[in-house]
Regions:
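Conserved alpha-helical substructure of the radical SAM core
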Residues: 2-127, 315, 319-320
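Flexible mid-to-C-terminal extensions adjoining Fe-S/redox cofactors in radical SAM and related proteins
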Residues: 26-28, 272-358
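Processing junctions and N-termini across compartments
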Residues: 32, 36-39, 254, 282-285
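Short cysteine clusters
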Residues: 38, 42-45, 260, 280, ...
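Short loop/turn motifs at secondary-structure junctions
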Residues: 41, 82-83, 132, 196-199
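Secreted/processed peptides and extracellular or luminal domains of membrane proteins
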Residues: 44, 48-51, 266, 286, ...
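Radical SAM enzyme [4Fe-4S]-AdoMet core and its adjacent flexible, acidic
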Residues: 57-58, 110, 134-267, 272, ...
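Alpha-helix termination/capping residues and helix-transition junctions
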Residues: 80, 130, 194-195, 285
Length: 358
C-alpha cells in the first residue's frame, strides 16, 4: 500500500521548524531506547556494547519500563524537552507494541514527528499507518544471504509477512561483505524499490568504534566507491534517497561530535529513561572519521544549504544554539540543554541534557 512518493524520516523543512525550539533553549530531537529487550543478536550492534553507556552499566542491565510507566515516561520526556522529532529505538521497540499503541497516537496529537525503528521481527499493525507524523523504518541489512544470518530471527520471510499492508521506510546499513559481489547494491535497491510496502530506502554505512577491527568495517576505498556509485543508483530508483550532496557529506563526515549537527541537536536516552547515550546515538567512542550514520550524513549536508544570500543553515544553527543557551540560563530551567554549555561534561546519567556546542 505504498504511496509511491518517497518520504525521508526528517526533511529540511522540519529542520527549519526546529529553529524556534533551539531559540527557546530546547533540544529539537530526542532518541529513546524504549526497551532493553531484543530477540536478535546482530554482530556489531552498538546498543549492547560494553561501552555504549560509558562502561558503568550496559543496556541489558538497566531497569526498563512497561505499561503505564513507560507510556507516561516517554510522553513526559517529550513534554520536558518540547522536542519536534523523536526516534524510538531499542532493543527491539516492538517488544512494547501494546505501549506503543498508546504512545504513538499521543505523540501525533502533540505535533511530534516520530520515527519508529524496528527489525520487523514482530508484526507492525497496519492501522498505525493512519497515524499522522509517524514513520516506521525497518532495518534490512543487505540481501538474504547476509541479512538472514546477521539478523535472525528477523529474516526476509518474516519481515515481508510482518509488514504486509503497511507503508514503511527501509533502512539499510552497508557493511564490507556486501561489496564483495558485483551488482549486489543494485539487486538490493531493485528488490525493495519493487515492494509496495516500501515507501523509501535510506542507507547508513557501518560506523565502528575507535580502535575496532571487524569484518563489517568499510575501508576508505569502499566509502569512495559508495559515494561514487550510490547516487547513480538513486537516479535509476527514485525510492532510494541518496543524492550527490549526501555522497559528499558521507565521504567527508563531521570530524567529531562537536562538529556533528545531529549530535548537537539530539538528546539520547536509554531504557531507564534517565541514562544518557553519549556523545551521540552510537554511544561509547564512535570513530567519527568513519561515520556512516544516515541522520548525521543528512544533517551534515543540510548545514551547508544556502537559505539567505550567502548564509547557510549552519550559520543560523550556531547563532540559535548560543541564543538558546542564554535563554536557558536566564530561566534557570532544570532541563536546560547542557550540551550547549562548553564547560559541561559530555557524558553523564543525571537530569541535565547532553552537552551541545556550536
Amino acid at each position: 500500500m505504498g504511496s509511491g512518493v518517497p518520504r525521508p524520516s526528517l526533511t529540511a523543512r522540519e529542520m527549519f521548524m526546529a529553529w524556534g525550539r533551539i531559540l527557546a533553549g530546547n533540544v529539537p530531537m530526542l532518541s529513546i531506547e524504549i526497551t532493553r529487550e531484543c530477540p536478535l543478536s546482530c554482530p556489531g550492534c552498538y546498543a549492547y556494547g560494553d561501552q555504549h553507556l560509558g562502561g558503568g552499566v550496559t543496556l541489558s542491565k538497566l531497569n526498563d519500563y512497561r505499561g503505564h510507566a513507560l507510556v507516561d515516561g516517554v510522553l513526559g520526556l517529550v513534554r520536558k524537552h518540547k522536542s519536534l522529532h523523536i526516534s524510538l529505538v531499542g532493543g527491539e521497540p516492538m517488544i512494547r507494541h501494546r505501549e506503543l499503541s498508546r504512545i504513538l497516537p499521543a505523540l501525533s496529537k502533540m505535533g511530534v514527528f516520530t520515527l519508529l525503528v524496528t527489525s520487523g521481527v514482530i508484526p507492525v499493525p497496519p492501522e498505525w499507518m493512519k497515524i499522522p507524523r509517524l514513520r516506521v523504518a525497518i532495518s534490512v541489512d543487505g540481501l538474504p544471504e547476509h541479512h538472514d544470518i546477521r539478523r535472525k530471527p528477523a529474516t526476509y520471510e518474516r519481515i515481508l509477512k510482518n509488514i504486509a499492508r503497511c507503508d514503511v521506510n527501509i533502512h539499510w546499513t552497508i557493511t564490507r561483505p556486501m561489496l564483495a559481489r558485483a551488482g549486489y547494491l543494485e539487486e538490493y535497491v531493485a528488490f525493495w524499490s519493487g515492494r509496495p510496502e516500501a515507501n523509501c530506502i535510506w542507507m547508513s554505512g557501518y560506523t565502528p568504534q575507535i580502535g575496532e577491527q571487524s569484518a563489517e568495517m568499510l575501508t576508505p576505498e569502499d566509502r569512495a566507491a559508495l559515494a561514487r556509485d550510490l547516487p547513480e543508483l538513486a537516479a535509476r530508483y527514485p525510492k532510494f534517497l541518496f543524492h550527490p550532496g549526501l555522497a559528499r557529506a558521507f565521504l567527508h563526515p563531521p570530524k567529531n561530535p562537536r562538529d556533528c549537527l545531529f549530535a548537537k541537536m539530539s538528546a539520547n536516552y536509554s531504557a531507564d529513561l534517565k541514562s544518557r547515550v553519549e556523545p551521540c546515538v552510537f554511544g561509547g567512542n564512535p570513530d567519527c572519521s568513519q561515520c556512516g550514520c544516515a541522520a548525521s550524513t543528512g544533517l551534515h549536508w543540510v548545514r551547508g544549504v544556502k537559505v539567505a544570500g550567502g548564509l547557510r543553515v549552519d550559520h543560523f544553527v550556531g547563532s540559535s544554539v548560543r541564543f538558546g543557551a542564554m535563554m536557558s540560563r536566564l530561566r534557570s530551567r532544570p532541563a536546560k540543554p547542557t550540551r550547549w554549555t562548553p564547560s559541561s561534561p559530555t557524558r553523564g546519567t543525571g537530569d541535565a541534557l547532553v552537552q551541545i556546542e556550536s
